Design a protein with these regions (language model features):
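Membrane-interfacial alpha-helical segments at the cytosolic side of multi-pass membrane proteins
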Residues: 114-121, 206-223, 256-265
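Membrane-interface junctions at the ends of membrane-embedded or membrane-associated helices
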Residues: 219-226, 264-278
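N-terminal transmembrane-helix/juxtamembrane module of multi-pass inner/ER membrane proteins
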Residues: 1-2, 19, 23-113
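Hydrophobic core of alpha-helical transmembrane segments in multi-pass integral membrane proteins
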Residues: 2-16
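Membrane-interfacial catalytic/cofactor-binding modules of polytopic membrane enzymes
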Residues: 148-219
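Interfacial segments of alpha-helical transmembrane regions
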Residues: 25-27, 113-148, 154-165, 214
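Aromatic-rich transmembrane-lumenal/periplasmic boundary elements in polytopic membrane proteins
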Residues: 34-38, 42-60, 136-174
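Interfacial helix-loop-helix junctions of multi-pass membrane proteins
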Residues: 153-157, 200, 235-261
């Protein structure tokens, strides 16, 4: 398991005096990787039942799109005349949107890590610590959500119907079009190693760049950095739905997860500021 290698690396870095400081500061990131990989040992579907149909129909009731053409009707998993957004985009997509979707999704983890490294290397250690521990906290909240409510993503219902099959492999869904377009098997490689396909709620894809944007604003980064992060964030939200990897409901809950995580992380400072201004 990858988590074993992370634990060994962390122990080695902590044992060596010259890298001990680095190990201390990057502890949240190591813990994130260890916890995520360790979820393979006890998957969420061993704790609670997997929901496939209820989330699909909730999405349809809130954001359903009328199906009219034969291609649209064939794409509807429950054979009605109402599509979820993921089904609509499975029929209606274009090369330019597919390319942008892949670029946005590739920013999901690398940009937050790059932002953390920037804060660390430029000695903005106060903000580095706050952002790093907030990142871990948001993930922990999200992981708890996975275990409370195991849920299948849209592509599962679109490809397999509404019966949960535990050994279902990861699926690139709409992101496969990016792999085909570029000739690179990036997303096939990433989703083939997915720790658990029944972990759609909340969408941590929606959370990471939102968290990064929030801390870019809080730490008063230049306006163009904030705008760039915000655009990537919005792009990832759109891609999550466009590619069939998440429902709009998942994305909204991912946003809520981020807000809760930031409020918990910054609660002491927010309370002190409120008392000061009262």
């Amino acid at each position: 398991m990858f988590s074993i290698y992370l634990i060994i690396l962390l122990a080695v870095l902590a044992a060596w005096k010259k890298t001990r400081r680095f190990a201390f500061y990057f502890l949240p990131w190591f813990l994130f990787g260890i916890i995520y990989d360790s979820m393979r040992l006890y998957p969420n579907y061993m704790v609670n039942d997997i929901d496939v149909a209820n989330l699909y129909h909730a999405e349809k009731s809130l954001f359903g799109i009328a199906a009219s053409s034969s291609a649209e009707l064939q794409a509807v998993a429950d054979h009605t005349q109402l599509m979820i957004p993921g089904e609509y985009f499975k029929v209606h997509h274009c090369g330019f949107a597919d390319f942008l979707a892949g670029i946005f999704y590739l920013c999901w983890v690398p940009v937050p890590i790059a932002f953390a490294l920037y804060l660390y290397l430029t000695k903005q250690l106060k903000w580095f610590r706050r952002f790093s521990w907030a990142f871990l906290l948001v993930n922990v909240i999200g992981f708890i959500g996975y275990y409370i409510y195991p849920a299948a993503p849209p592509w599962y219902a679109m490809n397999y119907g509404f019966k949960a099959v535990l050994n279902t492999p990861g699926n690139v869904a709409g992101l496969g079009r990016w792999d085909e377009m570029t000739g690179l098997q990036v997303f096939h490689g990433l989703y083939g190693k997915n720790a658990n396909v029944f972990a759609a709620v909340p969408s941590l894809h929606a959370a990471y760049m939102f968290l990064t944007t929030i801390y870019a604003v809080m730490s008063r980064k230049r306006w163009y950095t904030v705008v760039l992060f915000a655009c990537i964030c919005l792009g990832i939200w759109w891609t999550a739905v466009y590619s069939g990897h998440h429902y709009i409901i998942d994305v909204m809950l991912g946003i809520l997860t981020t807000i809760v995580g930031v409020l918990l992380m910054e609660s002491k400072r927010l309370w002190a500021r409120l008392k000061k201004n009262s």
